[in-house]
C-alpha cells in the first residue's frame, strides 16, 4: 500500500512560500501519523506543487523533520497546470492522499483525507 501526503498546508502549516522553504513550521500531528504508517510498513509518497527547482530545500526540510518517504514528486519545470490536475498525476499508484485542498481531493482519483 502507498499513502501520499501533500507538503504545504498538510505536512507544513503554511502554503508554499518560496523565500521561506527551510523555515516552514511542521504539523506534528500529521507527521506523527505519517511515521506511524511508515513503521507499519506502508510506503510513503510525498507530493507537492512546488517547482522542481526547490527539490534540495524540500528534501532538506523533510530530513530536518525526520519525515520518512520513498517517493517525492514535484512539479516539473514548465508545468503550469492547475494544482488539481497536477495532483491527479502525482498520486498515481497511491491508495490514499492526505491533502488540505478540497479541489486536489476532488480530482485526485484516490480516497482523500482532508486535513
Ranges and model annotations:
Residues 18-45, 56:
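Short, acidic loop-to-helix structural element flanking the phosphoryl-transfer center
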Residues 42, 67, 110:
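Short phosphate-binding/catalytic loops that engage adenosine nucleotides
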Residues 91-115:
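Acidic, Mg2+-coordinating phosphoryl-transfer loop and its flanking beta/alpha structural elements
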Residues 1-16:
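Asp-based phosphoryl-transfer active-site loop
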Residues 52-95:
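Substrate-recognition "cap/lid" segment bordering the active-site pocket of phosphatases
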Residues 35-39, 63, 106-109:
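Anion (oxyanion) recognition and catalysis
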Residues 10, 52, 103:
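Conserved Rossmann-like nucleotide-cofactor binding loop
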